[in-house]
Swiss-Prot record:
InterPro entries cross-referenced by the UniProt entry: AdoMetDC_fam_prok, S-AdoMet_deCO2ase_bac, S-AdoMet_deCO2ase_core
One family name in Pfam for this protein: AdoMet_dc
UniProt-recorded name of the protein: S-adenosylmethionine decarboxylase proenzyme
Keywords: Autocatalytic cleavage, Decarboxylase, Lyase, Polyamine biosynthesis, Pyruvate, S-adenosyl-L-methionine, Schiff base, Spermidine biosynthesis, Zymogen
EC number(s) per entry: 4.1.1.50
Gene, per the UniProt record: speD
Amino acid sequence: MVKPLPRLRLQGFNNLTKALSFNIYDVCYARTEEERQRYIDYIDERYDADRLTQILTDVAEIIGANILNIARQDYDPQGASVTILISEEPVIDKKQAGKELISDAVVAHMDKSHITVHTYPETHPQEGIATFRADIDVATCGVISPLKALNYLIESLESDIVIMDYRVRGFTRDVKGKKHFIDHKINSIQNFLSKSIKSRYEMFDVNVYQENIFHTKMHLKDFDLDQYLFEEKARNLSFKERMKIEALLKLEIEELFHGRNLAE
């Protein structure tokens, strides 16, 4: 729950921009080239533009935003993108309103308040590793907080590794003329995660409080090889194969978590 600061009387509109960015990774091992292609096909179907649109529509509802417009696209050979423009203000139905135009407040939001997702399935050419990355951005202007959607987004995707960035920009002015550069209390993105998620993930923070920049990265605590094997069971593998695959997967997870190559 986002805890607001004591209610402020504002001069005009709340001009604070709040942006939450996710990089969510799913890691998998598929032994053959054919299995890796089937993994890509599976991910491409599971997270196509229609499914992503539903997830982002749910996000808009969770944060209390109104949807202005939806653009979505599936790509060949793989991947998908969805962009939703949102606003705080209710949307006027032009069919019902005749020639009535959407209010200036709504139009003013269109370049600032949005939810986007892009997906990137890929595979290693030799070692059997396959990954799926979803990049999600929720940017709002006004009192709407993207932090309300944190838990839903993590639970909606196959989240082995999650990298999150949250920042607040701009200012809003109260009726006495004083500028306010943030309108809610926060010292870590972790403040807004559920107990269930916190219990399952290792987390690491890098925060720059004076700049209103908050960064949290996390990965699953428990490693269950069966959860990472595609179309295979660990019990069907030899001990040597299990150790090799486990080492490859753990290295991949560490490299994605730290954002650099560790084996070189």
